Amino acid sequence: MALLAAATLNPTTHLSLRSRAGRNSENLWLRSTASSQKSKGRFCNLTIRAGTPSKPAEPIGPVFTKLKPWQIPKRDWFDKDFLFGASTSAYQIEGAWNEDGKGPSTWDHFCHTYPERISDMTNGDVAANSYHLYEEDVKALKDMGMKVYRFSISWSRILPDGTGKVNQAGIDYYNKLINSLIDNDIVPYVTIWHWDTPQALEDKYGGFLNRQIVDDYKQFAEVCFKNFGDRVKNWFTFNEPHTYCCFSYGEGIHAPGRCSPGMDCAVPEGDSLREPYTAGHHILLAHAEAVQLFKARYNMHGDSKIGMAFDVMGYEPYQDSFLDDQARERSIDYNMGWFLEPVVRGDYPFSMRSLIGDRLPMFTKEEQEKLASSCDIMGLNYYTSRFSKHVDMSPDFTPTLNTDDAYASSETTGSDGNDIGPITGTYWIYMYPKGLTDLLLIMKEKYGNPPVFITENGIADVEGDESMPDPLDDWKRLDYLQRHISAVKDAIDQGADVRGHFTWGLIDNFEWSLGYSSRFGLVYIDKNDGNKRKLKKSAKWFSKFNSVPKPLLKTTNNNATMTAASVSV
């Protein structure tokens, strides 16, 4: 996976007004373009468009509510070149963990060695069996009218030992997948690494804790460029490095499962205040080396793009105070800026340098030059938002995890006692579409408005949800996606350069430490019927949504006006 604005709208006239309203109590049919807290209340900038329906929009409220027909996003709200697609990752769907010469990954080792660390004691040995059923995945994409499929390459399927001899069977598998996508008019977007480092490198030198990983990753990336670059024109070097570093080396709940002694994790032999930054530093150096190689040898004609996919979370101040406003800024730095700031400007955010001290490694001048402006495209993986609450920097508070370093706690409930949005089937995801709009506007206003793709966005169905007894009737997912697609359009209307939206995920998959208890797919995987693929309600909606003939869609107009009212309030 699977867990910040003034608009110029053309050509319609519009009226802006300021209205005092609660976060979940807005009963107008309009779009929230910005919000800020003032004394004794919350103000929202609201834009009313001429010619749109006069009926009120349904507020999100504390629980899920289905949208009215006129609130549902339409494909012609977006430029014809805007890409809708879906995402997956290798370990979560492929299975065939030891077939055809594949070597074990850190996730193979983690699940086999510490099965109790997975909520349902499962693993990715078979997963959705996409290694054998990839054509069914391609068919599902085509049935939904999706134009893009973002998937990842299993490092240990290509290089079983992490380096050295290439496994031709692995190359053949990805060639077949890529060719099948292209034959069905679906564009492949490839993530080179999505958390599944070869276990051989973990055993040899500690994986991303050792600088040797930089050279070995570069070799792996070159194998990918050399074998697939004639057809793959869009690459992401790394997926969600922030979550990886925090969960794998801070809390230790993901492979390789390291944390400080005395903490509860699989391998309590690490340093939760230092190792996340060491691993993250090596990820950034590996990214820079791979990008330099790519641009020097494999993109001479300039027709390909490369970047990184960042996990991001939106933040609002816990209450109307200077300290919580500052806490919000630090939270954004530590969540989004940790990896984004270096690939834009060449170094970590100032707040991180100030608070972390010598635990945060330094870049050389040469490394900074390689990192700065190293992304042609950027991916944002957005699921949810939080309130950010200041934590006093006092002797009474001592950080124990790297996530404590921001001196800001992440809260699901604000000072008024209200949740930031309705909770979804997955405990950590609260629906807050405005958070996505806000982050896209940060990309525009703070980071130079680079081309951005929403590379992951979605929620999970969970076992035992009585409101959704039929696994194919995923109306909550549909509502969530519709509201977030509208939130993307909000940002586009305000000038953000957003190029696509990829739902997480294409199919139900192995959801890391949650196993198969959380189902994020547009497509249901029937484990009792040979992993048979079945389209859910959300998938069938995309089939209709994407059915608009391309000649009827607009061309290159990021400020195109919506044809229906926004619902991302």
Curated annotation (Swiss-Prot):
Note whether Chloroplast occurs among the keywords. yes
The organs and tissues expressing this protein are described as: Expressed in young seedlings early after germination.
* PROSITE patterns assigned: GLYCOSYL_HYDROL_F1_1, GLYCOSYL_HYDROL_F1_2
Q: Write one Pfam family the protein is assigned to.
A: Glyco_hydro_1
- Domain of life of the native organism: Eukaryota
Q: Which reaction does it catalyse?
A: Hydrolysis of terminal, non-reducing beta-D-glucosyl residues with release of beta-D-glucose; DIMBOA beta-D-glucoside + H2O = DIMBOA + D-glucose; DIBOA beta-D-glucoside + H2O = DIBOA + D-glucose
GO (cellular component) term, any one: chloroplast
An example Gene Ontology biological process: carbohydrate metabolic process
Keyword terms: Chloroplast, Disulfide bond, Glycosidase, Hydrolase, Plastid, Transit peptide
Q: Which InterPro entries match?
A: Glyco_hydro_1, Glyco_hydro_1_AS, Glyco_hydro_1_N_CS, Glycoside_hydrolase_SF
**Keyword set includes Hydrolase:** yes
Q: Which GO terms describe its molecular function?
A: beta-glucosidase activity; DIMBOA glucoside beta-D-glucosidase activity
Q: How does activity depend on pH?
A: Optimum pH is 5.5.
- Give the positions the UniProt entry annotates as the active site: 240 (proton donor), 456 (nucleophile)
Q: Which positions are annotated as binding a beta-D-glucoside? A: 92, 194, 239-240, 383, 456, 504, 511-512, 520
Localisation: Plastid, Chloroplast
Name which cysteines form disulfide bonds: 259-265
Record's function text = Acts in defense of young plant parts against pests via the production of hydroxamic acids from hydroxamic acid glucosides. Enzymatic activity is highly correlated with plant growth. The preferred substrate is DIMBOA-beta-D-glucoside.
Q: Which family does it belong to?
A: Belongs to the glycosyl hydrolase 1 family.
The miscellaneous remark of the record is: Wheat is a hexaploid with three different genomes that contains at least four genes coding for GLU1: GLU1A (AC Q1XIR9), GLU1B (AC Q1XH05), GLU1C (AC Q1XH04) and GLU1D (AC D5MTF8). The monomers can aggregate in diverse combinations, reflecting the several isozymes found in the native enzyme described in PubMed:10750901. The hexameric structure is required for activity toward DIMBOA-beta-D-glucoside.
According to UniProt, the name of this protein is 4-hydroxy-7-methoxy-3-oxo-3,4-dihydro-2H-1,4-benzoxazin-2-yl glucoside beta-D-glucosidase 1b, chloroplastic
User: What species was this sequence derived from?
Assistant: Triticum aestivum
Q: Which gene encodes it?
A: GLU1B
